[in-house]
């Protein structure tokens, strides 16, 4: 049986050096730079067919704005935002998705939308990307959302419709291979979020020294899924400790309860006795452990 994988939208096909490298300067002709699309093709078996359509673009040209009026950089910025190496074809992308067994939607921001001196009026998926993603989901096919960019983005209206979500950030020179290996299950993901994801645009990302909000968030700091599961038990914490000690020893047991080998990031958080502290909860330590079932 032939399985068709539909790749919709173009971050992963065109000019990966700018999409994957953030604001850094790298050589676009360097053969080591590979897109996710090009990384997927040789990794798929003969029973898989990979299709591609660029359904929508990054954003409208006015999505990013320079605050100071009359800034001469505005014209250059608009030209950067209008760059598109592939023409978009919304209908063709939706048609490909409806005919596919699995849909990979590569969305998010590029360095002209998120980077040094780049500002947007909101943090939802830019331009028409959210509407495009909703139409992909409406086909009824499993949609794997890959999000690129340098900050959290609000996805409250689409997350429930996605079969899986992979936050790829700006993955760098080998990002294409790394993301492809995770998508295909060649690598078991183990990363944890270094920021919290807001549920709506009305909430701001908080730092520990701003207290702990009672508002629900989409994904908390330290969150991350795996292709396996882990179980914690036997927490061992000393009843007393000297404040002059360089460290205290805290331990627990971690068991891989899933079906495949995986890495878990064990995180230790501490809270002061006073609830009025400016830092009510802090990450104080972590350990990376590789476990077999």
What do the PLM-derived regions correspond to, one by one?
Residues 1-21, 27-37, 41-47, 51-81, ...:
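Secreted, periplasmic, or luminal enzymes acting at the cell surface/secretory milieu
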